[in-house]
Every structure is written in structure tokens, then in C-alpha cells.
Amino acid sequence: MSLFEGWPDLVCFDLDGTLIDSVPDISKALDIALQSVGAAKAGEERARAWVGFGSSKLVSQALEWSGTSIDTHESCHSAFLKAYFESVSENTTLYPNVEALLKAFKYNGVPMALITNKPSVFVKPILEHFGLSDYFSWQLGGDTLEEKKPSPVPLLHCSESIEAAPERCLMIGDSVADARAAQAANFKSVLVSYGYNHGIELSTLNPDVVIDDLAELLM
């Protein structure tokens, strides 16, 4: 890997928009939640633009879009969590070459972490559904630690636990939260172009590399 001399000492992966396309299931649950408080359905494309900063923020954005009182946030958020848990992997898919990359890192002895802003209750079921759980020594949700991305805390939690120098560590993600967390932690960063980037030109986030396919990291 050209970003490092040899293999990195640690690789941290984002989940939604990086390893999996989860929007079909997220948007379905969000629409159920919105309807439960008398709001209109948002639909998949709108939900795609809101994903990435955790479920509470997602619900807040949806309520604001629909013109519904923020006073309904607690009940709407609870309805979303319930609906999403019931169909967390129903229509979610892996992006191409995810398993090939994970296998390559594992074969070469690279520790891996899964760091997402998604509530931790959803992380294990999704990883187990796709048979990916055993690849990750850390599985951190947005509520696992006191801070979540774009804070560097989750990244440094992992690197410090194995005494890995930050400059020898890599964050792979798709969004501004991933880029900012990596920069604050002094990790190298790779952003994927196919994820949930909220219309931001990824090069403006100053990642080390932007790729269109995870297979590019195997070249």
C-alpha cells in the first residue's frame, strides 16, 4: 500500500456508505417513524443525504424537512430505532470487494476496527449478517464512547490500545466525519467516492486518497 512503508499498523473502517449500502433499510424505518408522528414520508434519496451523523441527527433532519415540531423528536427517534432493528439487514448490501480487502488485511496481520456513528445495538447484527464480525477487533458504535466521529476519540481509543503510532494508522470512510476524525487523530485517510458524502467534493476534505472502489487499495 503506497500510503505506508509496508502495511499499516491499524485500519479503521466506517460502516454505512463505506462497507455497506444501508440506506434502503434506514429510509424504510425513517418513513415508518415519520408517519408515526403524522409527518410525510421522506423517501430513500432524501434519507441518503442525511445518513452519517447518527440516528438522532437523522431524525432531527427529517423532522425539520417535514416541518414537524422538534417536540416529537423523542417519540419519532424511538419509533425509528424500533422499526430499524426489525429490518436492519433486510435490503442492505455489501459494496464490491469489501471481503477481499478485509481478507487481505487479516492475512497480513493488520488489526482492524469498525467505527461508526450508528447506535451500537445495530452494529453486531449487521456484521454477523454479512459474516464480517470476526474481522474486527473493535466494533464501536456512536454511543460506545463519550465522543463519536468527527471527534478523534474513537480512532485514538483503538490505536492507543495497541500502542500504534497514529501516522502508521489508516481511516477508510466516505464522509466529512471520517475525514475530520482522521485528521484530528493524525491518521492517514482514504475516502470512497460511492458513499454518503452529502454532495461535498471529497478532495476539499483533504484526504490522502480518494478511491472509487476498495479494490484500488489492493493494487
Description of each model-found segment:
Residues 39, 65-68, 132, 164:
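Helix N-cap/coil-helix junction residues
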Residues 27, 31, 44, 48, ...:
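An amphipathic alpha-helix signature
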Residues 61-100:
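Metal-dependent phosphoesterase signature
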Residues 2-49:
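Active-site neighborhood of HAD-like aspartate-dependent phosphohydrolases
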Residues 97-109:
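Catalytic-core regions built around general acid/base machinery
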Residues 1-10, 106, 120, 124-219:
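Asp-based, Mg2+/Mn2+-dependent phosphohydrolase catalytic module
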Residues 33-34, 54-69, 126, 158-159:
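Helix-loop "lid/cap" segments that line or gate small-molecule binding pockets
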